[in-house]
Amino acid sequence: MKLSQIFKFIVLVTLVPVTAFSASVDTVVTYSKVMKKEIKAVVVKPDSYSAAKKFPTLYLLHGAGGNYSDWVNQTPDKNTVKRLSDELSMVVVCPDGGVTSWYFDSPIDKTYQYETYVSAELVAFIDQKYSTVSDRSGRAITGLSMGGHGALYLAFRHQDVFGACGSMSGGVDLRPFPENWNIAKRLGKYNENPERWDANSVINLTHLLTPNKLAIIVDCGTGDFFYKVNVALHDKLMDRNIPHDFITRPGVHNFAYWGNAVAYQMLYFSKFFKHDQQ
């Protein structure tokens, strides 16, 4: 290689921008009074974070079998959530969901009261500890799989707390899966307690919604085992004239899909935050 070519190569290399994600990741320990135990959460703060400004917050829930660290450790690009937090200037909170809590208050197990924990105790902790917008205009919630169910469930039932919600590959109807993911341990057996399964399936909570009260985004891959129940939820929302974004594309139930989907969801929430706070 000629000297002039080497020089050109060096110049080109030095001109390539280096992207640094400066978002900070805290692991915090919260205490649940209702469950009488400590629960961990990851909190991602954007590089622009300052106590002098109030930041919107996204609550990002993990799936069955996962934990609070999944969203910063399991996506193909482990910087995904940090990068999006930086780019969109939002705080991201990833709580632990007790492996298979399904994010509701179990009627049979007092150690699984995750609806109360996430929608009340955790939100109060975050608003006290961090500089956040402390009303529904600055809060969104989404998640994957079990967390997708949980996010919609909590937002539908607590519209005074969350202004926007989403789901990625969410298990939005529990009833087709009576033997899976410890749901029966939280609600009792389906054939013995069908009313509990009905009452705690997101697809049966659309009557709580009124048009334009909640910003809603639902995403599920066509190869996902939850695809049919997501289409059914979409159809039910359409029948009730509830505006929402519904995304479906080729994909299955894995982090490759969710690592892509979360970018669309966070952009959607960023637009909601900007619009609602104007």
Q: Model-found features: residue ranges?
A:
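Sec-dependent signal peptide recognition
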Residues: 2-12
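Hydrophobic h-region of N-terminal signal peptides that target proteins for export
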Residues: 12-21
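Non-catalytic cap/lid and distal C-terminal segments of serine-dependent acyl enzymes
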Residues: 22-278
